[in-house]
Amino acid sequence: MDKITVEVIKSSTSYIAEEMGIILRNTAYSPNIKDRLDFSCAILSSNGELIAQAEHIPVHLGSMAIGVKNTVDYLKKESIEIEKDDVIIVNDPYIAGTHLNDITLLKPIFYNDEIIGYVANKAHHVDVGGYAPGSISSNVKELYHEGLIIPPSKLVINGKLNKELLNLITSNVRVPKSTIGDLKAQIASLNIGVERILKLIEKYGDREVTEAWNKSLDYSEEYLKSKIRDINCICEAVDYLEYKDKLININMKIEIKNGKIKVDFTGTHRQLDAPLNAVYGVTVASTSFALKAVIDPDLPMNHGIFRVLNIIAPEETIVNPKKPAPVSVGNVETSQRIVDVIFKALYHEFPDRVPAASNGSMNNVIIGGRGWAFYETIGGGFGGRNGKDGVDGVHANMTNTLNTPIEVIENEYPIMILEYSLREDSGGAGKYRGGLGIRRVYKMLSDCMLSIIADRIKISPWGVNNGYSGACGEHYVIKDGKKIPLSGKDTLYLSCGDIVEINTPGGGGYGSPYERDINLILEDVKDEKISIKSAYRDYKVKIIKKDDDFVVDMEETKKLRGL
């Protein structure tokens, strides 16, 4: 097969995954999916290997490569035959590869009575039952506390919705209308995916399409090998998660040698009776994302890269726990720390490619009451990079979602937003400043339960190359005028009128702040990104307010900087 045809089929397949995402977004019910875009779509081979994916959520996509293959293997093991118009549903993290809120749907692509591949999507449902509204809480001790566990089962049988299974699911969740609407949107997305793949086959032929898919895997394998062929290194690092009064270590050693990459998590903290555990699928997703980001962001992401990558994640650790350890937080927080520790290790080999640490948390806010549940993640600062400041107020690394529009929150939930702003002085000082964190303030308009799942409250996002650390996160509840600090992982009841203040971490700085352009510092002060005090203390630049403007006192600044 000629290379042009292979490329056309490969690109067409990727776009089909993108179109699946468009359909899912446009037909979804919940704000978390239709507004925040907390979902992912992919196309896989007949044995469950990842062929193509849309540019959606990294933690979903990397784990989909594990989860779909596990599901296909489960169906074979249990002698469950999947027919042409069936749709499989699964959310068991130890099969599907993330956490219970992420419900995966899978549909076979039949051609000439044979399965030639699968279309799949994964979407974060705002509630799947369990201990707390939103199904994510730091208080849980085992998986059963986190919600309804669905093994691979037929949600659609011969084209008809399995109402018995759907009734079972909706009887165990707090917002059944949302669950039904989002599941139907996922089904519609799969139907479009199958339809488009069959049209591709009609145009090029089934053998040609599957051959092009296989060649795309070969290409990714060879592409990655070509990028590391001349690299021979061993890099090590450790970073930490915060849980109560403990620091939970993630140890990691990377060896790049002879066109292969080995990532070894030996020495990482043992699994916890707390939800910080990350199932193997999350570890794979985080590892592959971090390596791609550093080695070559243009690396085509499919199963071919796993032929080059060997991940050693010891069992019964927080990066490969044993069921029924709880895992809801591992998906959203431990995933971020895995990326950080890999970046930290690779900085020594790739100093020009690795940024300072980003905010390092998805900053999860889950609020719910009788008959409703609200979930969002809040962005923070991106780390400063060689040649560029970190981006302010963005979702970094393992998440790729949008913020929830204030108008949507106030229309859909008994919540009022009092403030949504950037945190002055939260970005780490550096030649290239870290991005700023976010302040978001909520007022409760009814009694409810709040869960905060965040990190980098004690250990700040690190800077590199003499850059300073970004600011830690700070979270508060204001009750009866009293401002009460929260830890990064809290679940508590709130009363109508209570106020919740979330301050997300900033990104670390890159390079010495004394090398930062003075004019950029002046602009930062004018834009209220850094204060006059920070300019003086961290950058050795004296700025004074003159009338309604700010100016640099160059004489004093030269003294401060030794110029």
Curated annotation (Swiss-Prot):
One GO MF term: hydrolase activity
Q: Which InterPro entries match?
A: Hydantoinase_B, Oxoprolinase-like
A Pfam family this chain is assigned to: Hydantoinase_B
Q: Which cysteines are joined by disulfide bonds?
A: none
**What is the similarity comment for this entry?**
Belongs to the HyuB family.
Q: What is this protein called?
A: Uncharacterized protein MJ0963
Organism (species): Methanocaldococcus jannaschii (strain ATCC 43067 / DSM 2661 / JAL-1 / JCM 10045 / NBRC 100440) (Methanococcus jannaschii)
Higher taxonomy? Archaea, Methanobacteriati, Methanobacteriota, Methanomada group, Methanococci
